[in-house]
Amino acid sequence: MKNILIVGAGFSGAVLARELADRGGWKIRVIDSRDHIGGNCHTEREKSTGVMVHKYGPHIFHTDREDVWEYVQRFGEFRPFINRVKASIKKGVFGLPVNLHTINQFFGKNLSPQEAKEFLKTVGDDGIQEPANFEEQALKFLGRDLYEAFFEGYTLKQWGCSPTELPASILKRLPVRFNYNDSYYNSRHQGMPVDGYTAVIESIFDHPKISVELGTEWNETMKKGHDHVFFTGPIDQFFGYSEGRLAYRTVFWERKEAEGDYQGNAVINYPEKDVPYTRVHEHKHFAPWEEHEKTVVFTEFSKETEEGDIPYYPKRLAVDMKLYESYREQAQKASGVSFLGRLATYRYMDMHQVIGEAMDFSTKVLEAEGGGQDWPLFSGE
């Protein structure tokens, strides 16, 4: 029987732990530096309002993978939830992503889907042949009015740099729907866990061969006594930031309680430059089957990650990817350790991607062990 150490008690660590314990019969020790499980997906019910709060920002579960959808439902009840994001600007409140209703409302028109496609061609900048950055990509396909209303200021606030400094690949495809579908996601399955994400992860960890230790920092001496370490934290942290820190954006919130209904929607974006925050979350709307007299609202701000901050969004600019490659080279020389999850592989990942990748990674580990081969070094490869 293998003795395994997993660093990190979020979805990556939890799913890997469960799969290796269930299918491999291995003994799993999980540690996390925080005082709770769940990582940034952590949810808790507030005493003062009774509302289930997403402590590190809103998380809406959505996936097209049937096996992932079935997997999470093994560990908790999910109810249907469609995230309908609004954008508040001086001109009014509009639906996001930009859809047919947004276009007609914004331009004061009554266009059909085909007419809207033709209309956007007339307002888009056809002088841009090969977009070199985010701004040019948006101007080419959306035109200046929609770009400035919904994308320019929000991007500047979220990423802390000009949209001209960001790669065009961020807008890989036209971010417009030529219908009245105002669901933020297109995924087949969308839902919210009735008892919160932390309860789901707690259920995943509920196995006789899994132990979880909170408030426990990782250090190299912990390798002793374990056959292998799976690290789900920041890869630059694992190597002591020896090459420098990978760049992330982080977020912070101003919390406010109110009576009744504060904004009438779970998430409202504020894309204009002169508004310092990016969006406002009203958490009771993430559980519309519940009723609460009070409400709790979080106003979200974005900033560059500094020492001690929780990393959220990897910037992944050219200089960052070069730095990440240097850490990957160090990882190739390390022994007895593998890396998985968004922080360890320096990627932005949604929950369903994290879970699916951990499921796939566990299969690769077990198959490698069964075949007498080297275990995989990185997830997602």
Show where each model-derived region lies.
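Mid-domain catalytic core of redox enzymes
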Residues: 23, 216-330
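Active-site/ligand-binding neighborhood in enzyme catalytic cores
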Residues: 90-94, 100-228, 239
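Dinucleotide-binding Rossmann-like beta1-alpha1 core, especially the glycine-rich loop
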Residues: 49-123
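N-terminal Rossmann-like FAD-binding beta1-loop-alpha1 element of flavoenzymes
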Residues: 2-30
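Glycine-rich FAD pyrophosphate-binding loop
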Residues: 21-47
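Short aromatic-enriched loop/helix-cap "lid" or pocket-rim segments at secondary-structure transitions
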Residues: 41-44, 98-100, 226, 293, ...
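Generic structural signal for residues in well-ordered beta-strands
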Residues: 28, 210-214, 337
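Conserved flavin/dinucleotide-binding core of flavoenzymes
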Residues: 45, 281-381
